[in-house]
């Protein structure tokens, strides 16, 4: 018997960032006011060897006004080459992840407990930086 769980029925799934090229990208700001847990999934298709830094920011408003980096480390998983493997390897808990320079498609998952966000900051976004315009992220 399968476990009675369905992602579309038991979770709120959103696309916070449409696939696009760019060196500095910020996703939508998503309210976690009623969430028990959030997973931020990032696909990075590196077309250039520049290292990409992926981080999470918190804000008191869905407009993003007053945003600051998260301060509590969160669990992170990484698939270094999603074209050849589906293995997600747990990384050291952190507030950001710097990807390697390999020209591969990478999958990164951040697991966020909204209770660990700064008091009054219940909105989350994902930011990519230190990248290159040839790198595609979603």
Where do the language-model regions lie?
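Surface-exposed, low-hydrophobicity beta-strand/loop segments enriched in small/polar/acidic residues
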Residues: 1-138
């Amino acid at each position: 018997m399968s476990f009675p769980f369905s992602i579309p029925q038991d979770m709120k799934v959103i696309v916070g960032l449409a696939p696009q090229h760019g060196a500095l990208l910020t996703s939508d700001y998503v309210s976690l006011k009623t969430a028990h847990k959030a997973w931020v999934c990032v696909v990075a298709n590196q077309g250039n060897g520049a290292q990409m830094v992926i981080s999470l920011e918190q804000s008191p408003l869905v407009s993003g006004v007053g945003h600051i980096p998260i301060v509590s480390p969160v669990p992170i998983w990484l698939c270094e080459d999603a074209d050849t493997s589906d293995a997600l390897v747990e990384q050291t808990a952190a507030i950001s992840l710097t990807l390697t320079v390999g020209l591969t498609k990478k999958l990164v998952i951040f697991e966020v407990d909204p209770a660990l966000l700064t008091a009054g900051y219940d909105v989350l976004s994902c930011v990519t930086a230190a990248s290159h315009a040839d790198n595609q992220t979603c």
